[in-house]
């Protein structure tokens, strides 16, 4: 007898191979399931195809329950263990799945998803996630399945092998000196090494939560997490304390680390000079070097870069040494080497060594030299040039 209610047939769809696909959907009530056989009949011309629809309602069938777990190597590397409880071939659909740890019911950490099989029975999976540190404490985990008055339990024991999972380590990085001197906001970085799965990283300033961003595993190792927060430059310069807080269910208490701008009592302004190749070398070589010597400054935070005709030079085209202490250990120096083509020098281009340091009255100074200048000239960089340097980074 043809069915006329609860039926929805969708338009034919042209496939890439030039054939068509058509779908038909039948909706019935739960009470109608199993009351009679249902067939899908397809006619095309004189051809007829008939397919019986499987019935998900039938005799009572209790499930088969199987437990599997991830390997110890995977648990150590991913920082969590996965236990899969497979509940296979049961009928009717209604089941209850519970997880126990050492005989105590667990309230969270697992997800259960039932599905209907094509053979008229149901199957389901329940996935339990356990932090690695907890897994390696030899606890017993139980998947308990109740179906039609019958309860089945399957146990699995965590590894007795000690976990090689070290405690998380927090490393805080201050903003770059270039950010501090040139921008209205600066970025603080919190690097969490040995980060467990599901770690939460947040920032606070004197009990006030700050909006931050987190990136997973961009650090030096696969188990690191980096969280960044943007604050005003003024707040950083004020010496305020900023806290990175690491939370995880595996930690007895949250881990905290703080950072602030250190107060500098001995500010020393740097001297800047450019060292040129000897005149005879310039005429004899295709390339020549400009060396910028910056010395006598304190504290050690500084940036040095170059411009050609007031346009920033790509950092890959010059080389800065590490900041080094001078003989008295109370001040520092740094070299920057720029290689240029002799033809460019001969054309009259102007080369500037741009230096930023908090002891400089205008925060930035430069030395400029070109073929016709005779000797390097010292210039306090103007606000207009400051904007140019900043925009060309």
UniProtKB/Swiss-Prot annotation:
InterPro entries referenced in this protein's UniProt entry, alphabetically: Ig-like_dom, Ig-like_dom_sf, Ig-like_fold, Ig/MHC_CS, Ig_C1-set, Immune_Resp_Modulators
Residues covered by the Ig-like domain: 63-157, 168-260, 270-370
Cross-referenced Gene3D superfamilies: Immunoglobulins (2.60.40.10)
Protein's recorded name: Ig heavy chain C region
PROSITE patterns from the UniProt entry: IG_LIKE, IG_MHC
Organism, scientific name: Heterodontus francisci
Record's keyword terms, sorted: Glycoprotein, Immunoglobulin domain, Repeat
Residues bearing attached sugar chains per UniProt: 119, 155, 200, 230, 329, 366, 370, 380
């Amino acid at each position: 007898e043809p069915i006329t209610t609860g039926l929805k047939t969708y338009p034919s769809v042209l496939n890439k191979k030039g054939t068509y696909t058509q779908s038909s959907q039948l909706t019935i009530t739960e009470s109608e399931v199993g009351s009679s056989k249902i067939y899908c009949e397809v006619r095309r011309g004189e051809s007829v195809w008939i397919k019986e629809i499987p019935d998900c309602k039938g005799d009572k069938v209790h499930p088969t329950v199987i437990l599997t777990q991830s390997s110890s190597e995977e648990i150590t590397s991913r920082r969590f263990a996965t236990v899969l409880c497979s509940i296979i071939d049961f009928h009717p659909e209604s089941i209850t799945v519970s997880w126990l740890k050492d005989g105590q019911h667990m309230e969270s950490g697992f997800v259960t998803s039932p599905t209907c099989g094509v053979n008229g029975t149901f199957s389901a999976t329940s996935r339990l996630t356990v932090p690695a540190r907890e897994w390696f404490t030899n606890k017993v985990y139980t998947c308990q399945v109740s179906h039609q008055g019958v309860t089945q339990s399957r146990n699995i024991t965590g590894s007795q092998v000690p976990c090689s999972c070290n405690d998380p380590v927090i490393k805080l990085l201050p903003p770059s000196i270039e950010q501090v001197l040139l921008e209205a906001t600066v970025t603080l970085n919190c690097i969490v090494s040995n980060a467990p799965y599901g770690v939460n990283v947040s920032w606070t300033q004197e009990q006030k939560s700050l909006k931050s961003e987190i990136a997973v595993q961009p650090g030096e190792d696969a188990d690191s997490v980096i969280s960044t927060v943007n604050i005003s430059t003024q707040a950083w310069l004020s010496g305020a304390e900023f806290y990175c807080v690491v939370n995880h269910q595996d930690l007895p208490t949250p881990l905290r680390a703080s950072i602030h701008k250190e107060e500098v009592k001995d500010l020393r302004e740097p001297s800047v000079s450019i060292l040129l190749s000897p005149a005879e070398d310039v005429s004899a070589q295709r390339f020549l070097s400009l060396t910028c010597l910056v010395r006598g400054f304190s504290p050690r935070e500084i940036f040095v870069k170059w411009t050609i005709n007031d346009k920033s030079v790509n950092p890959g085209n010059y080389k800065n040494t590490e900041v080094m202490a001078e003989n008295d250990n109370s001040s520092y120096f740094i070299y920057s080497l720029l290689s240029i083509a002799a033809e460019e020098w001969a054309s009259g281009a102007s080369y500037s060594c741009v230096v930023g340091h908090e002891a400089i009255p205008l925060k930035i100074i430069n030395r400029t030299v070109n073929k016709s200048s005779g000797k390097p000239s010292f210039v306090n960089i103007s606000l207009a040039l400051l904007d140019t340097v900043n925009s060309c980074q």
